[in-house]
């Protein structure tokens, strides 16, 4: 017997329960990823019901906190509700995170929603080169997990004005910029590794993981060969866009013909991203409380909710 309840898209959409759509077409256009066509229908049928579910969880947490504060006779700032979003490279988890961030921030009871990606906790390019693991970027050993866990722990502890490193997909490195996170009501953490636990880090044993701090977790899923296809399509779009920008780490790929670019993207998938998905990301799927399963057209076709 499966630990998940399965919903078709049509059945799931009925759980919206008349919640109004607070995003415009322009909002959605700004939120979608380079390789996705996020429609209003997708937002209404999939993400509105999900935002309603998450809002109910947040309300329950806030009610519990108010009881505790009343009992203790204090008015300390309540810890944030932390949502983790995991999935493969190119599966669309960043778009999911941005849409949920926008929707949740419009609910009356928790207007302050922050989104942080784990990319900012990758080791700098120089350190990855020194350790000889540049080709393992995105694998467990390429992250400063102690720093990431400390950040999430500090957020949960209610510490103000926390700083998060900012990662650039143009320079392929950590920048000097920082993002400030100041006691949000809801924190969304998006990344390849947010559902990983001790068994995924045998090389660097520590007792606490991001997954230990999550109040709700989402895994964005699709068939591996479908994600590979999306990765190749995204690579081709980057070749004509982001890779052409000044300072781009991948500027040399702009000189490739389209066929050469396709073959290069397939090689990168085969040697790096596909292996990381199979070995380190996919095994964490069953730990999620909700799975969004996508079809070939990037649209969510099935929703699995843990009982």
Curated annotation (Swiss-Prot):
Family: Belongs to the prokaryotic pantothenate kinase family.
Enzyme Commission number: 2.7.1.33
Enzyme class label: transferase
Keywords assigned by UniProt, alphabetized: ATP-binding, Coenzyme A biosynthesis, Cytoplasm, Kinase, Nucleotide-binding, Transferase
Nucleotidyltransferase among keywords: no
Subcellular locations according to the entry: Cytoplasm
Reactions mediated catalytically: (R)-pantothenate + ATP = (R)-4'-phosphopantothenate + ADP + H(+)
Classification via InterPro entries: P-loop_NTPase (IPR027417), PanK (IPR004566), PRK/URK (IPR006083)
Pathway this chain belongs to: Cofactor biosynthesis; coenzyme A biosynthesis; CoA from (R)-pantothenate: step 1/5
Protein name, per record: Pantothenate kinase
Domain of life: Bacteria
Higher taxonomy: Bacteria, Pseudomonadati, Pseudomonadota, Gammaproteobacteria, Vibrionales
GO BP term, pick one: coenzyme A biosynthetic process
